[in-house]
Amino acid sequence: GVFISSAIQGPGVVKQMGGTGQLFFGPVDRADVEKYRPIEALLQDAGIKAELSADALLPLWTKYIFIGPMAGVTSLTGKPFGEVLGSPDDRVLVEGMMKEIEAVARKKGVNFPADIVQASLGKAAAFAPATKTSMQLDYERGNPTELDIFIAYMVKAGKELGIPVPLHRKVYAELMMR
């Protein structure tokens, strides 16, 4: 997973606008983790904040629990991170969506820390207040979006696992009307 806020400015030009600029990666089979140490060292030597994880699902879901709700709510409201987190209603929606993802991920065997939702909200607050998600920018520009990845997937997973995800259903329905 990658934690960064960036946008395509033109052909061959990507502008980083904020975020921690971190890269998390790992093998599918945790027994292979040591084979990836040279890649981690190479990235770190190049000045990239890279972290190798023996449990590749944990960093993947850690990014998902953060970016899915932020992408959904910023796209729905048209507000950047700072305004979403500063609005009590929007913040409650983001937090509720994070809790829905936590329930689905735990059912799938992801071993989140107990404070994953609060940590994810803190991660969002660390971004520049004017930060927009790539999905929000895609909606603004009329481009194809990541709605299926960030929101529809949770609706489907919740249904398959018997876990209620009413907030994801609501956001999905509203964004589908755009």
Residue ranges and their predicted role:
Residues 1-13:
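Rossmann-like NAD(P)(H) cofactor-binding subdomain of soluble oxidoreductases
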Residues 7, 74, 149:
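Active-site-proximal flexible loops/turns
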Residues 13-63, 68-115:
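Internal alpha-helical scaffold of NAD(P)-dependent oxidoreductase catalytic cores
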Residues 34, 44-45, 83, 93-178:
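NAD(P)-dependent Rossmann-like dehydrogenase/reductase catalytic/cofactor-binding core
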